[in-house]
From Swiss-Prot:
One of its GO terms (cellular component) is endoplasmic reticulum membrane. It comes from Rattus norvegicus. PANTHER family: CYTOCHROME P450 3A-RELATED, CYTOCHROME P450 FAMILY 3. The keyword Membrane applies. This is Cytochrome P450 3A18. The gene is Cyp3a18. The lineage of its organism: Eukaryota, Metazoa, Chordata, Craniata, Vertebrata. One of its GO terms (biological process) is steroid metabolic process.
Length: 497
């Protein structure tokens, strides 16, 4: 039996040439950082360094920082990434050179109409959307929207009381995932779901499908390894977002818009209505009005960017409060003083709670919403002696930045006092980036913080939080791309009544 097949010389030449071309494609960009004198892990042909993500992106970033220092290079497939943890360079990337060089985020592949979402749009289109949407997230608009958000806070408390009455420990992600979903769907689409008690609601089902991303998903992997396939996928109407969910929400926004126009509900204050108002304003320039497709894209991206991040962040806060009774008690005292006799929370009272702000900020330092901030270099540029070629993705690794002992005393410790009035002025704004910084920071930052704080106030007004036998101490972080605990955070709630 022959081990080597008996092929013609032409076939062998063709096979050898194909393998050589494949190897060249898989390695052509992998010498970039070595040429520039920038350290980093050794890439594997075709795949780059993505296999190093096995223990999680955050762990890879942390290990690289400890090994290579504040600047290193790595590769996702053929795409070069330059990681930076120098505050001066971070400031240049996020702020000073934002409009001229680092305007755009990384493209993740074929996105269909989701390219019209503010987080994924580019250059002039992004500027236009930011200009239109920024007034929607002002303090004044959020204050108007606060009664609607508080309504979902009341639903959260009803659900918590029912769960607490069972006497069983509670899965934090389940309860706060439902709360987060209700707040976002209510404020984005104007629907009341009560997703904890209606998990089969089509709205909830379609929304959760949007959030299912696996780091080694074959389709995503094909986009990472062969970026040239993206326009082909676009032509074939493929998308990284599930088509059924996209069509569902696109149709839903159109229906909701028609219903509101028919019933003349112009006074409702939610994101959908505020976006509709850009179309209805007299004298509104056509380029400043959102199309129906753009409205759908923004509403969907609110779910994509807000649901998991908010619910996971609240769960982390609850874990820290449960395992630090002194911090919990101090925060309860502040809440009780501001809202005696369990008075309903007001927007102004929430915004004035200093210790609550300190606790939330410290939790976001230890457990950042995003593991990285990415910007693509639009041209060759040199910053502080570091040459960055056109097309390089400049990434800021948030986890190691937030735990860097050079900037944070005892960085692994949960210490809200870091963010006290006396101390927070000494924090460099470019080493604490839970929502990014500069013109392209998270537009929904205020909304997310209000959402988190509203939940924390409601819980601590009515319950004491305690660890139980099922609580994982110390907490371990998942290997998934989204920063989250390895297992569910399970805690016990005890009524204060």
């Amino acid at each position: 039996m022959e081990i080597i097949p008996n092929l013609s010389i032409e076939t062998w030449v063709l096979l050898a040439t194909s393998l050589m071309l494949f190897y060249i494609y898989g390695t052509y960009s992998h010498g970039l950082f070595k040429k520039l004198g920038i350290p980093g892990p050794k890439p594997v042909p075709l795949f780059g360094t993505i296999f190093n993500y096995g223990d999680g992106m955050w762990k890879f970033d942390d290990d690289c920082y400890k090994k290579y220092g504040k600047i290193w290079g790595f590769y996702e497939g053929p795409q070069p990434f330059l990681a930076i943890m120098d505050p001066e360079i971070i400031k240049m990337v996020l702020v000073k050179e934002c409009y001229s060089v680092f305007t755009n985020r990384r493209c993740f592949g074929p996105m269909g109409f989701m390219k019209k979402a503010i987080t994924m749009s580019e250059d002039e289109e992004w500027k236009r959307l930011r200009t239109i949407l920024s007034p929607t997230f002002t303090s004044g608009k959020l204050k108007e929207m606060f009664p609607l958000m508080r309504q979902y806070g009341d639903t959260l408390l009803k659900n918590l009381r029912r769960e607490e009455a069972k006497g069983e420990p509670i899965n934090m992600k389940d309860i706060f995932g439902a709360y987060s979903m209700d707040v976002i769907t209510g404020t984005s689409f104007g629907v009341n779901v009560d997703s904890l008690n209606n998990p089969q609601d089509p709205f909830v089902q379609k929304a959760k499908k949007i959030l299912k991303f696996q780091i080694f998903d074959p389709f995503l992997l094909s986009v990472v390894l062969f970026p040239f396939l993206t326009p082909i996928y676009e032509m074939l109407n493929f998308s990284i977002f599930p088509r059924q969910s996209m069509n569902f929400f696109k149709k839903f926004v159109k229906t909701m818009k028609k219903n509101r126009l028919d019933s003349n509900q112009k006074n409702r204050v939610d994101f959908l209505q505020l976006m509709m108002n850009t179309q209805n304003s007299k004298g509104q320039e056509s380029q400043k009005a959102l199309s129906d497709l753009e409205m759908a894209a923004q509403a969907i991206i609110f779910i994509f960017g807000g649901y998991d991040a908010t619910s996971t962040s609240i769960s982390f806060i609850m874990y820290e409060l449960a395992t630090r009774p002194n911090v919990q008690k101090k925060l309860q005292n502040e809440i009780d003083r501001a809202l005696p006799n369990k008075a309903p929370v007001t927007y102004d009272a929430l915004m004035e709670m200093e210790y609550l702000d300190m606790v939330v900020n410290e939790s976001l330092r230890l457990y950042p919403i995003a593991t990285r901030l990415d910007r693509v270099s639009k041209k060759d540029v040199e910053i502080n002696g570091v040459f960055i070629p056109k097309g390089t993705v400049v990434t800021i690794p948030i986890y190691p930045l937030h735990r860097n002992p050079e900037y944070w005393l005892e960085p692994e410790e949960f210490n809200p006092e870091r963010f006290s009035k006396e101390n927070k002025g000494s924090i460099d704004p470019y080493v604490y980036l839970p929502f990014g910084n500069g013109p392209r920071n998270c537009i929904g930052m205020r909304f997310a913080l209000i959402s988190m704080k509203l939940a924390v106030i409601g819980v601590l007004q009515n319950f004491n939080i305690q660890p139980c036998e099922k609580t994982q101490i110390p907490l371990k972080i998942s290997r998934q791309p989204i920063f989250q605990p390895e297992g569910p955070i399970i805690l016990k709630l005890v009524s204060r009544d």
